[in-house]
A protein has these predicted regions:
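PRPP-associated nucleotide enzymes
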Residues: 1-137
Length: 137
């Protein structure tokens, strides 16, 4: 990931986006999400400079940040839910998830517990369900 972000090739991606892009960085992938977001912003700036035409009519052109704020809170009995804190209607969404991130912890019954791969996957399913549950494009 680091090599790809640092070796920016200005001629590689000269395309208009089909729809506004959204990026969700699940717990444990926040650092990588920031890197992908900075690369996408660089791509957006380069596209605006190099492509002919008016980019202001392109869907999502006014966004300054591609990261979408989400949370997966837990209830007292251990159950969880996925919450997306802004509208993503019409967006092309990408989700970064690392099921092996044992450094992510949550509190249950007053104890701090590391997240298992199954819990990461359950949070991923919760966010997909909160998005509408299926791909539209």
């Amino acid at each position: 990931m680091t090599d790809f972000v640092s070796t920016w090739n200005k001629d590689s991606f000269l395309t208009y986006p089909v729809g506004p892009l959204g990026l969700i960085a699940m717990p444990g992938t926040e650092e990588m999400g920031v890197k992908v977001n900075s690369w996408l912003k660089k791509w957006q700036d380069h596209t605006e400079e190099s492509m002919p035409g008016d980019m202001s009519t392109t869907p999502g052109a006014e966004r300054q940040d591609f990261l979408i704020d989400v949370t997966c809170p837990r209830f007292g009995n251990g159950e969880g839910k996925g919450m997306i804190k802004e509208s993503i209607r019409g967006y092309d969404m990408y989700i970064l998830c690392d099921p092996g991130a044992y450094n992510v912890e949550y509190k249950m019954f007053g104890q701090t517990i590391p997240m298992s791969p199954d819990e990461h996957f359950a949070n991923l399913k919760r966010i997909i369900a909160a998005m509408g549950g299926k791909a539209k494009r």
